[in-house]
């Protein structure tokens, strides 16, 4: 998993909780990399899972809720860090339906070793978008949080539902 995910997670923990909480989470998680990440590095998915579990235990909040909140935070950071991805995109459906062919294609150019999830458009019309999420990491809560962040960014009254079948 790319280091930007790790650095942004730690940034969110610092903003929403405290710098001390970041230190506690890193200590509790007993991470092989010691909590030191670079945005362009690649790290095991298990390390971020360990940090989320440690945060959940410290904060008393459910892991899925924390991961979804992180997804929302991460989308906002992507808007700031990668404005070109949003240029000319008029709405949430336009952005979400272009993740695989536009966003991930560009990410692969920058980071050929990136292990990205897949977002397959199963159905799309003016009122409904059905996306299929595929990833061996099963970070569905993160994907859902990113979608909520997208909807909030475009300020649209879109309801997100999840089918786990």
Residue ranges and their predicted role:
Residues 21-58:
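Long amphipathic alpha-helical segments
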Residues 141-156:
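Short, non-transmembrane amphipathic alpha-helical segments
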Residues 110-115, 152-158:
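Short secondary-structure junctions
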Residues 1-34:
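Charged, compositionally biased N-terminal leader segments and the immediate start
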Residues 47-140:
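Amphipathic interaction/junction segments at domain boundaries or subunit interfaces
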Residues 160-165:
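Beta-rich nucleic-acid/ligand-interaction surfaces
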């Amino acid at each position: 998993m790319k280091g930007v995910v790790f650095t942004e997670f730690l940034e969110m923990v610092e903003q929403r909780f405290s710098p001390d909480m970041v230190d506690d989470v890193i200590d509790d998680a007993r991470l092989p990399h010691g909590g030191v990440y670079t945005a362009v590095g690649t790290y095991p998915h298990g390390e971020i899972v360990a940090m989320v579990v440690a945060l959940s235990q410290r904060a008393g909040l459910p892991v899925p809720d924390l991961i979804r909140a992180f997804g929302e935070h991460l989308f906002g950071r992507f808007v700031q860090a990668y404005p070109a991805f949003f240029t000319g995109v008029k709405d949430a459906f336009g952005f979400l339906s272009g993740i695989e062919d536009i966003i991930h294609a560009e990410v692969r150019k920058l980071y050929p070793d990136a292990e990205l999830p897949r977002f397959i458009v199963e159905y799309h019309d003016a009122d409904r978008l059905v996306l299929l999420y595929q990833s061996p990491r099963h970070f569905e809560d993160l994907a859902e949080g990113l979608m909520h962040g997208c909807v909030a960014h475009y300020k649209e009254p879109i309801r997100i539902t999840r089918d786990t079948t």
